[in-house]
Regions:
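Conserved short beta-strand edge segments in small beta-sheet-based binding/regulatory domains
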Residues: 17, 52-54, 83-91
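Surface-exposed aromatic
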Residues: 58-65
Length: 91
């Protein structure tokens, strides 16, 4: 498994008590390192993304995002605007 971890930001524990961390999971076509490098600045600079990673060797090229307040539609818009496929995977 080849997983890329990015944008790991520490979170104040008092914030977690008010709002739990949500894990959003998406099917993508982020297959190559160049694809990840292309979206890296977009995801790293997004203030609502605590942590993200891509499993390029999963059949669905899974993008996993940890957040407290971002809606899946926002991630889909961000990734598709960069020219990639992105679809939320069901729980």
């Amino acid at each position: 498994m080849n997983v890329h971890f990015k944008n790991i930001n520490p979170v104040d524990s008092s914030v977690l008590k008010k709002r739990p961390v949500r894990i959003l999971v998406f099917k993508t076509n982020l297959r190559f390192k160049k694809d990840i490098r292309h979206i890296e600045p977009l995801l790293d600079q997004h203030p609502g993304i605590m942590c993200w990673n891509v499993d390029r060797y999963d059949i669905d090229n899974v993008l996993r995002i940890e957040t407290m307040h971002i809606q899946p539609k926002e991630i889909i818009r961000l990734v598709t605007k960069a020219g990639y496929f992105c679809e939320e995977l069901p729980d």
